């Protein structure tokens, strides 16, 4: 009987000590804020502001463009974006296809298009796909942690 009483008390204590974890994460709310960040990226990029684009990344961010090595950190990202802009890249547009994650990280899958201009004349159109890992650094403030993309254009032989 003593054992039954001890087991009953232990069970009551265990049940009483359990805390239910419920998440209040709202992917639609996150998407609203990430969409705003994407709009800023497009505005900065299309206006030649590599610093503005770099500021949309966390300090330790990595960027993985096609046909080149890994780019680490905001300063290196700023330089890479500046090089792209100097090469004539402009008119970038992002289209989000999917977004999923949690309160800490969200993965965005999408498509992009851009133009390459020389003396104001379009000399090439490019389009492709991307994946971005967004990190929530404070309430409703999402910055890029990792970014990888590639072009749909065939490699010239």
Where are these regions (language model features)?
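Generic short beta-strand segments
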Residues: 110-116
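Short beta-strand edge/turn micro-motifs at domain boundaries
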Residues: 127-153
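A solvent-exposed, acidic/Ser-Thr-rich amphipathic alpha-helical stretch
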Residues: 29-33, 50-102, 111, 124-125
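Sec-dependent N-terminal signal peptides
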Residues: 4-14
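Short, low-complexity N-terminal intrinsically disordered segments enriched in polar/charged residues
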Residues: 17-51, 55-56, 156-157
């Amino acid at each position: 009987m003593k054992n039954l009483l001890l087991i009953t008390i232990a069970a009551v204590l265990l049940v009483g000590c359990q805390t239910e974890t419920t998440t209040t994460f709202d992917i639609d709310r996150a998407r609203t804020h990430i969409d705003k960040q994407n709009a800023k990226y497009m505005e900065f990029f299309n206006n030649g502001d590599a610093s503005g684009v770099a500021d949309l990344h966390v300090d330790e961010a990595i960027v993985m463009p096609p046909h080149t090595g890994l780019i680490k950190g905001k300063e290196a990202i700023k330089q890479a974006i500046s090089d792209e802009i100097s090469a004539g890249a402009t008119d970038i547009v992002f289209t989000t296809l999917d977004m999923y994650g949690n309160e800490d990280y969200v993965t965005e899958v999408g498509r992009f298009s851009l133009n390459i201009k020389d003396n104001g004349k379009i000399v090439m159109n490019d389009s492709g796909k991307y994946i971005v890992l967004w990190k929530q650094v404070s309430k409703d403030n999402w910055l890029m942690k990792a970014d990888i993309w590639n072009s749909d254009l065939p490699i010239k032989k």
